[in-house]
Amino acid sequence: MKLVTIVIAAATTLIPIEAWADCDAQTGKQVYNKCVACHALEPGVHLMGPSLHGLFGRTAGDLEGFVYSGAMTNASFIWDQQTFGLFMEDPMQYLPGTTMPFAGIRKPEQREALGCYLAGLDDID
């Protein structure tokens, strides 16, 4: 099972930049202002929520150094464009039991822009 997770994670690390090639990262940076109080962008810097650095291609609830809710720890998905969009639309509906105190981002274009911004940061490293 671990090998399958590793293969899927490796395959999805290429998805964000290609999938968001024509997206609006500048708007995403503005949308990130809703996240900045709880999530840092620097690797290993955890606030109320985990660092968002390197999010895409990572297994949910598996970032070293952060204590996740049971729901997130037991989640079995890899962060990609689709899971990010669904989660950010309504975190508590997508993952019941999550402790992320955020109602979600209703506008699809804002979710896409935020994902684009975060994926672009991963590409800079």
Give the ranges of each region predicted by the language model:
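Sec-dependent signal peptide recognition
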Residues: 1-9
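N-terminal signal peptide c-region/cleavage motif recognized by signal peptidases
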Residues: 16-18
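Sequence/structural segment immediately N-terminal to covalent heme-attachment motifs in c-type
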Residues: 22-47, 52
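Extracytoplasmic/secreted proteins, especially bacterial periplasmic and envelope-associated proteins
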Residues: 27-30, 47, 51, 67, ...
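Sec-exported extracytoplasmic/periplasmic mature domains
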Residues: 33-43, 57, 89-93, 119-123
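Solvent-exposed helix-loop boundary motif
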Residues: 49-70, 89
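Short Fe-S-cluster ligation motifs
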Residues: 64-85
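C-terminal capping alpha-helices of c-type cytochrome domains
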Residues: 80-125
